[in-house]
């Protein structure tokens, strides 16, 4: 099974569900936990923004330092950083210290925007043949999404801990302790990666991006920054807060909604790999993502929880098809030796717009309307979809040119 995947690729596939499980239950409970400490939603948005700025700097640094320090050492460092932040959250009640740890380690975000995941995707790209690259990314995202679903349900432990006599804050600290332990497991698995994970000797010279790659970098950066800005308005932490405030849902119910969302996303990942072989990567990205963007914009106008969740879950089934296809496409159109540098530079403007989004969303939720971020996100993402198709529909990856 998976005999076409290099050993390092298999290790990274084992890492992904642990990583996703831990990030899922923390990101769902993060904003609500900070609210119990007395912070407003606009302040929480600023903390999320600070975390993404920190992640952006680490992302950029990893792209430039991977050849000098090694990918494995960087991955171990990022794993220890997350574990340390989790330890702080599980032991401290000092708000200032918690905010510092959250910003430094980007606690509260779920997804593939961290420096560790950027390095993992680069290693994965060299763990199989080009013809199966999209399939490998789809498998990685599928196991991650299934683990995210499980992690979402795991937030129900908060309710169980409360029934056992734990205080509200004490229950949250137990969850962060589990987050710490899981990140230490990730560190151990990163250590198992072999030399093939590193940049090849002939690639260790200063990488200079070619003219065509630079052109792709500018175009994709602008477009992906738009998509990231839209996504930043609806992070899992902020959606959980919206469900908590708008409908008064308990954490176990919120966890069930996110679990269902992740299961639908998991189904879409493998479908994306199959569909992309028939209609191409760009067409798969746009034709699935555009309807999802329209659904997102309509969510706050739904009169009941049921109708809102019908659209939210429908969006989950469609919107994530662009994840493995996007990851595969951006690896395919550049040379192997350019990939890490390209990805780190590509993520820089994207991470910036992702960083400012939660602050704006928090302001909109507090002062304009709690559902406003859904509308803004949907409109931005729909414009992105159209521009992406117009710009890149004729630029094919190698496997589509054969």
Q: What residues fall within each predicted segment?
A:
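Structural signature of the two symmetry-related core transmembrane helices
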Residues: 73-88, 283-298, 378
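C-terminal membrane-cytosol helix-exit motif in multi-pass small-molecule transporters
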Residues: 180-200, 384-392
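Helix-loop boundary and gating motifs at the non-cytosolic
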Residues: 2-57, 216-224, 228-258
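Transmembrane alpha-helix termini and helix-breaking/packing motifs in multi-pass membrane transporters
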Residues: 32, 149-170, 356-375
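Helix-to-loop junctions at the C-terminal end of transmembrane segments
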Residues: 58-70, 159, 268-281, 365-366
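Cytoplasmic helix-loop-helix junction between adjacent transmembrane helices
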Residues: 103-144
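Hydrophobic core of transmembrane alpha-helices in multi-pass small-molecule transporters
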Residues: 17, 85, 95-115, 307-321
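Conserved MFS/SLC helix-loop-helix module at the cytosolic interface between two early adjacent transmembrane helices
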Residues: 57-93
